[in-house]
UniProtKB/Swiss-Prot annotation:
GO cellular component terms listed in the entry, alphabetical order: plasma membrane
Alphabetical list of PANTHER family matching this protein: TRANSLATION FACTOR GUF1 HOMOLOG, CHLOROPLASTIC, TRANSLATION FACTOR GUF1-RELATED
Any single biological process term in GO: positive regulation of translation
Protein name per UniProt: Elongation factor 4
Domain of life the protein comes from: Bacteria
Similarity comment: family membership: Belongs to the TRAFAC class translation factor GTPase superfamily. Classic translation factor GTPase family. LepA subfamily.
Positions that bind GTP: 23-28, 140-143
Listed EC numbers: 3.6.5.n1
Ranges where the tr-type G domain occurs: 11-193
The keyword Ribosomal protein appears for this protein: no
Residue runs in coiled coils: none
Amino acid sequence: MNKEEMNARQKKIRNFSIIAHIDHGKSTLADRILEQTGALTHREMKNQLLDSMDLERERGITIKLNAVQLKYKAKDGETYIFHLIDTPGHVDFTYEVSRSLAACEGAILVVDAAQGIEAQTLANVYLALDNDLEILPVINKIDLPAADPERVRAEIEDVIGLDASDTVLASAKSGIGIEDILEQIVEKVPEPSGDVDKPLKALIFDSVFDAYRGVIANIRIMDGVVKAGDRIKMMSNGKEFEVTEVGVFSPKATPRDELLVGDVGYLTAAIKNVGDTRVGDTITLANNPAEEALDGYRKLNPMVYCGLYPIDSSKYNDLRDALEKLELNDSALQFEAETSQALGFGFRCGFLGLLHMEIIQERIEREFNIDLITTAPSVIYHVNLTDGSNIVVDNPADMPEPGVIESVEEPYVKATVMVPNDYVGAVMELAQNKRGNFITMEYLDDIRVSIVYEIPLSEIVYDFFDQLKSSTKGYASFDYELIGYKASKLVKMDILLNAEKVDALSFIVHRDFAYERGKIIVEKLKELIPRQQFEVPIQAAIATKIVSRSTIKALRKNVLAKCYGGDVSRKRKLLEKQKEGKKRMKQIGSVEVPQEAFMAILKMDESK
């Protein structure tokens, strides 16, 4: 292909993604676009085609990214090449969304005609604007009885500030307006810029592990050209590989001779480790490297940690294998082995956020058949010690003694909640209970309000989302971003059973809430731990100070049953003997903590 043909081809390429809040119809719209452009026959079509994981279909969310190449014959008679890059919509995967948007020139913004703009719609629009994308608003689900397209159109103009005069009104389910969307993509989305003669620059926006071919990297070519046999280099770590195959997804993987500027496709190069193809990294040629990498790459660090332990300790090695397999596809997942006196052998795992954590746990239980005990999620604390050094703590059990701590800093997030104005009071009360600082509040229209708070991440990782949904009858939508660390009065609370610490039950809490939380946990454990032959004290302690205590009464055999009448000294002798036995038992007896006790503490609503 000569230079002119390449330039002509480049002018016909349109790269775009679809952004939307959960349940606004993103995957359905992608299905209709695939059908309309003839990528699939009606027979091959199944709903949510790009969401290939069962879990994605069930939860109705997109977790992994997918990219497809489509051909579309427009009304002007020309055939255009579309690359549709599917994005996850959830806040935990914000970085992945931003990288897949960086691979596009345009974005279709899908807004539900009944619900209007939600918190994550806004978050994703700002990401798209950061990447200078052309945004095409689409109001979806116009055939719903509750649809109010005019109100939503006004919201798009007022809240986001986009011109909504030529917004497409569509219904992905019924196939209304799909043609108009495709024509708008042709007219409004800019062609890819980039020069085929420059050294290769390709952005990795996702990677998956294949047992036979190694890592398959999804890439967008920004400059240059790549073909099988090229030696490539990763710009973040300098590692080199030889390309074995390049191709595109249409929607099945189809090998090609080469990928040119503007193309979105895949590349395999016998790469063994997903960690070598990090999302956002730049690929270049080893013998003719680009001078600088594409911007925006950063290493993903976990935000939330928790311990995963197999209920059946013989499955420890199976759990390690499961985590290693999941890590192949998910470079953000981190884990290391740890042991707990209470739970045995397991792993300390780091996740991007709560949804990420839930999905990994669910996949281990479902795909690998391992039943898990999970400890309470915790965040990463920065601890400044009295000797001037700093340490990072991600496990409450590792928190040093209070005497050597100068101060503790915890991560804060900026949380944006969108809610109907009837529930503003409930949301503000919840945020105050979670130690939130009020930042701002604005009315989006006469019904909806956007409220912004700064809240410690540790308060959100428990059950903030569940409580938010229940206090607003499910109407609130919520989005958060990390803003940095702030000093707080935090203390470590230990739970003692029969005067012994149970390491898996330790947690870090704000000093002002320590007494209430200690009291709740102690009462809860008293209900759940079965009675023993001896008295068991349960205590909640901060360092050496006990803040709450409860006692599980002993089970007692009636040793006097065999004395019919008889002398009182005989009875006393039997009672004394029983008392001695109980005392000895208490010294050597250990208390088994049932699985339910750990679960109850995790699920407990601690702010009450």
